[in-house]
């Protein structure tokens, strides 16, 4: 799809500085965010200043130096490209010169984030990771968080599952990593592991499952990309091993934005608009009409009839005495009689296509307020996304609220709280190889059949059959089942809606026990409820011909607790060590309740029915899963001679789906050889890493559970437990008490280098 993007960023600053005989201005990044600590210097002199936390700088010009002259201002900031500008210095008064710096991709890579959320120097690590800054994500113009990661890091494959707005996205790091489980990486937001599943549930199975139903959403897309400060992709097993059986597919560590400690309030408003268009249309033939063997035949599935160009033209010959189809009123009225001879040369390939597809559009508004001082900071944001898909009547709406606070209670205690609430709702279209889906009916429609007037009344022998579904297979609506849906019925009459309420919250207390020793306590929760409705009115194709209404209520809740101790030891100028010891407790609960009713007696568009009005009663099922895990983990980081860096780590994990504990070790070593290489090399590092990570078995696989609704015979004399009042027995699928996690062992080594003063890497 082609995308046209238009962004408007309006920063509003308070407390701007006024100065005389000076140069003043702001230093920001390309998104308009302030850069604190940037150095601004008058070229060739020692006169300069540093920008404050709001990006403001002010240089007082010494009397009798450069007044009335044109000078060059040089600005530099770590991680950004240096910039210069010519400025005319007035004889008196002030002049303003603002700078917008571009990201220096190589410079930013110096800082990375570890699996536990602590910052580290990438040049001192032997494991592999990639950093993605918020500016790169926002410039992608994508409406979904997952899609904005595409092309931002090597060996990270991002594939949207469909063109529906809000549709799920597959993220794979270094390809497939497991034969038994999902290949999605673990997502950690502000120290809290969150759910990123794409759940299809019972209702979607009713509508055809993954290949024939409607697509669902990746839960990572509940996050507003504009709230993110940085993303770290941990690719290797050695970098991710501390997460144990969750980390076989890598880890994506997300950090959201913090408030400002400048003492001033900052308000920012940003609006982004995007337009989506079909890039290329599937070529469809319009030479031959409906029929076979060179002859027109109405209502059959083939389009190898007569040549349309060789018809006589004009109106078709019809029989008005036979059954017919009628729809609309007044100027919009339409009547289709039984066709006796096909004369019309009209084709409708493009009209049928345009009736289904449109130019998609999304608009996102983001409002942010931040501020604080040396003892407290705050950030509040609101994001509003409205997206209409390229398929008519498909949409995705999302509202995000975020409140991040940080309080320094004393010299020893700091409290941080970050909370994000999301509400989203969407309507998605039935897809794939599905008789009630969109494309199978659209692509098989004969070129000389007009899909408009898809719903009306079939009249036969003076009897009216209202609400009939007209398609190219049943052009009079003569039967209740149209064989394949008319695509306009699919997008206008059927519904597949979802509404999600989600809360992600993490709290952290950092206690400085003494110089060099910190204790960090974290507690977080990720919980959501997903309410889904599927509605197929009477006359939908296939097994839904008598009408189906299905509902899913899916809830997921995860709580996570960490207690971490870190101690820094310095034995000499050439040898130091950081020891980290932690304990993690994690609970995950999932439940799904699915209900269905079908075979309506009355053809109605209302999505509420009485269970007694159907030929069959409503059916219901539910599923519940509870998983608990605990991990004890440790990291020992050794720095020798400021050239050799060794990290040893391990995690001992107990899991409710496994009967015994498992240990996941890891190590990495980095040796800097910069002092031993000639120009033009400015940096050289040899690295080696080894690690193990796992994939846990599904819940309860090591147990033999009870089952109900079983039969003891499948022959002509079945003995069913339901005939005897119900009951339970041990499942005939026996549990395996010796089941083990799937373990991935990974070894990697390589050379990292930079050249020409870090301009090339």
Question: Model-found features: residue ranges?
Answer:
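Outer-membrane beta-barrel proteins
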Residues: 135, 199-201, 207-208, 215-258, ...
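Periplasmic N-terminal soluble interaction domains immediately after the signal peptide in Gram-negative
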Residues: 46-47, 52-110, 244-246, 256-258
């Amino acid at each position: 799809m082609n995308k046209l993007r238009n962004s408007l960023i309006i920063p509003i600053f308070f407390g701007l500085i006024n100065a005389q005989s000076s140069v003043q201005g702001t230093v920001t990044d390309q998104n308009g965010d302030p850069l604190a600590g940037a150095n601004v210097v008058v070229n060739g002199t020692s006169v300069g200043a540093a920008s404050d936390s709001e990006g403001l700088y002010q240089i007082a010009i010494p009397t009798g130096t450069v007044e009335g002259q044109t000078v060059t201002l040089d600005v530099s900031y770590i991680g950004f490209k240096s910039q210069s500008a010519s400025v005319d210095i007035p004889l008196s008064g002030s002049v303003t010169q603002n700078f917008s710096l571009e990201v220096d991709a190589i410079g930013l890579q110096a800082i990375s984030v570890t699996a536990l959320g602590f910052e580290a120097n990438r040049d001192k690590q032997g494991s592999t990771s990639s950093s993605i800054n918020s500016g790169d994500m926002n410039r992608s113009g994508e409406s979904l968080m997952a899609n904005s990661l595409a092309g931002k890091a090597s060996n990270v494959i991002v594939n949207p599952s469909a063109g529906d707005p809000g549709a799920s996205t597959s993220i794979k790091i270094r390809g497939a990593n497991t034969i038994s489980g999902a290949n999605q990486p673990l997502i950690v937001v502000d120290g809290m592991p969150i759910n990123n599943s794409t759940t299809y549930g019972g209702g979607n199975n009713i509508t055809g499952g993954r290949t024939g139903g409607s697509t669902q959403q990746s839960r990572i897309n509940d996050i507003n990309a504009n709230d993110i400060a940085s993303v770290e992709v941990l690719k290797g097993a050695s970098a991710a091993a501390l997460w144990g059986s969750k980390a076989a597919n890598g880890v994506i560590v997300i950090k959201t934005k913090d408030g400002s400690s400048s003492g001033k309030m900052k308000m920012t408003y940003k609006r982004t608009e995007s337009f989506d268009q079909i890039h290329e249309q599937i070529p469809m033939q319009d030479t031959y009409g409906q029929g076979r063997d060179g002859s027109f035949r109405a209502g059959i599935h083939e389009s190898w009839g007569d040549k349309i160009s060789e018809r006589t033209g004009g109106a078709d010959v019809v029989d008005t005495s036979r059954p017919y189809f009628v729809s609309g009123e007044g100027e919009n009225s339409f009547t289709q009689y039984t066709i006796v001879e096909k004369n019309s040369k009209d084709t409708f390939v493009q009209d049928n296509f345009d009736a289904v597809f449109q130019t998609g559009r999304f608009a996102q508004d983001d409002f942010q307020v931040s501020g604080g001082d040396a003892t407290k900071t705050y950030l509040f944001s609101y994001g509003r996304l409205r997206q209409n898909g390229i398929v008519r009547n498909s949409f995705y709406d999302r509202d995000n609220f975020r409140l991040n606070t940080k309080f320094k209670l004393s010299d020893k205690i700091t409290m941080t709280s970050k909370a994000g609430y999301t509400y989203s709702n969407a309507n998605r279209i039935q897809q794939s190889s599905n008789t009630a889906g969109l494309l199978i009916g659209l692509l098989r429609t004969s070129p000389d059949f007009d899909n408009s007037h898809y719903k009306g009344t079939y009249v036969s022998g003076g009897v009216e059959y209202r609400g009939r579904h007209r398609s190219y297979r049943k052009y009079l609506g003569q039967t209740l089942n149209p064989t394949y849906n008319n695509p306009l019925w699919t997008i206008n009459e059927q519904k597949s809606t979802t509404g999600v309420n989600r809360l992600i919250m993490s709290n952290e207390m950092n206690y400085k026990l003494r110089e060099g020793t910190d204790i960090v306590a974290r507690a977080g929760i990720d919980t959501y409820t997903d309410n889904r409705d599927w509605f197929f009115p009477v006359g939908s194709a296939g097994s839904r011909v008598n009408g189906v209404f299905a509902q899913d209520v899916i809830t997921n809740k995860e709580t996570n607790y960490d207690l971490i101790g870190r101690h820094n030891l310095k034995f000499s100028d050439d040898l130091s060590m950081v020891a980290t010891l932690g304990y993690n407790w994690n609970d995950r609960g999932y439940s799904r309740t699915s209900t269905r009713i079908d075979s309506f007696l009355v053809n109605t568009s209302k999505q509420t029915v009485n269970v007694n009005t159907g030929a069959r009663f409503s059916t219901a099922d539910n599923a519940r899963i509870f998983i608990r895990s605990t991990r004890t983990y440790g990291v020992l980081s050794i720095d020798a001679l400021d050239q050799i860096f060794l990290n040893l780590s391990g995690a001992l994990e107990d899991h409710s789906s496994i009967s015994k504990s498992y240990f996941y070790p890891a190590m990495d070593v980095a040796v800097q050889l910069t002092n031993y290489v000639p120009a033009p090399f400015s940096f050289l590092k040899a690295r080696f890493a080894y690690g193990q990570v796992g994939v846990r078995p599904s819940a309860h696989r090591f147990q033999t559970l009870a089952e109900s609704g079983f039969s003891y015979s499948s022959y002509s004399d079945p003995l069913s437990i339901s005939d005897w009042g119900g009951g339970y027995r041990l499942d005939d699928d026996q549990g395996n008490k010796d089941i083990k996690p799937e373990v991935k062992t990974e070894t990697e080594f390589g050379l990292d280098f930079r050249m020409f003063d870090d301009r090339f890497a």
